[in-house]
Each structure stands twice: as C-alpha cells, then as structure tokens.
A protein has these predicted regions:
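Luminal/periplasmic acceptor-recognition loop/helix of membrane-associated glycosyltransferases
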Residues: 2-159
Length: 159
C-alpha cells in the first residue's frame, strides 16, 4: 500500500497484534481447548513484529519460553532467516514426537494478493479457511492489510 508517510509501514503494529489476539480469543470461544492455535506468519519480519506486538495474555499455543509465540513459516531447506534457528513448529522431539502435531494454527499474512496459505502449509494441514481480512489504519491512512487463515490439524513432516 502506498502512503504519503514514509514511516507508515512502521506504524500500526499494536493494532495488528491486538487484531491477531482478538481472532485468537474469538476462535478460542468455539473450542474448549485452551491455547489451541499456534501462530504462523508469512515471513520472518512479520513474525518478529507480531512477537513484539501480540499481547502477553493472547491465548495461543506456546510450548515453552524458548519457542517464539509467533513462528515464521518454515521451509525445511531454508535456514537463511533468524527464525530458522529458534525452536520450530516443524521440529521433532528426540523421541520422534512433535509438540505441534494435531494442533491448529492461525496463518497471518500482509500479502494482500494471497488468496490462500502457500502450498507448503496447505500440505501440512488437513484443511485451511480464510477467517478475516482487515485493513490496518494509522493516522487515517492504510498501512497494511492483514489476512488471517485458520489451518486445521497440523501434520509434521515425515522423518
């Protein structure tokens, strides 16, 4: 999105974090399972911004303080970004189990052209659906559009 304010992309992150938290809360109301969803961002920069702006009380699945609360989308062959070196949702425990198996996720993207999660995510989940599309406004100007998809029943990659 184009704005007159060159700092526009730096604005609106608290609103974006609150938006993701609201979706987590609303989806939680439909499920008795506390912290059912983990959060995946479409790229590591978005994941970093959401990790900082997502309220601490947001009910997301967070297995340990070592894990990020918002994960960057993982590609097993891509280790080029900072989130690749943090505990990952696609990693296995020493016993071969996954902390994220069968969990549901919210996939968050700021790519307004994206109509569905990327193929690597669609293949890892039983199904996906678009939950919401929301423009983020700062000082009366749009700074980004956020799309949030629900992704159901994560299946970690086979060993």
């Amino acid at each position: 999105l184009f704005t007159r304010d060159p700092s526009g992309p730096l604005q609106g992150w608290h609103q974006t974090g609150r938006l993701v938290a609201d979706v987590l809360i609303n989806t939680q109301l439909r499920s008795p399972q506390e912290g059912r969803y983990f959060v995946i961002a479409s790229h590591w920069r978005l994941a970093a911004a959401l990790n900082q702006s997502l309220p601490q009380d947001a009910p997301c699945f967070w297995p340990s303080p070592a894990h990020p609360r918002v994960h960057a989308i993982q590609d097993p062959s891509d280790w080029s970004h900072p989130f690749a070196h943090l505990p990952r949702y696609d990693a296995r425990q020493p016993d071969g189990t996954s902390l994220f198996a069968q969990k549901d996720a919210l996939y968050v993207t700021d790519d307004s052209a994206r109509g569905s999660p990327p193929p690597i995510l669609r293949a890892a989940f039983a199904r996906t659906e678009l939950l919401t599309v929301v423009p983020v406004i700062h000082a009366g100007q749009p700074v980004r559009e956020i799309k949030i998809f629900a992704c159901y029943s994560y299946q970690p990659p086979q060993l």
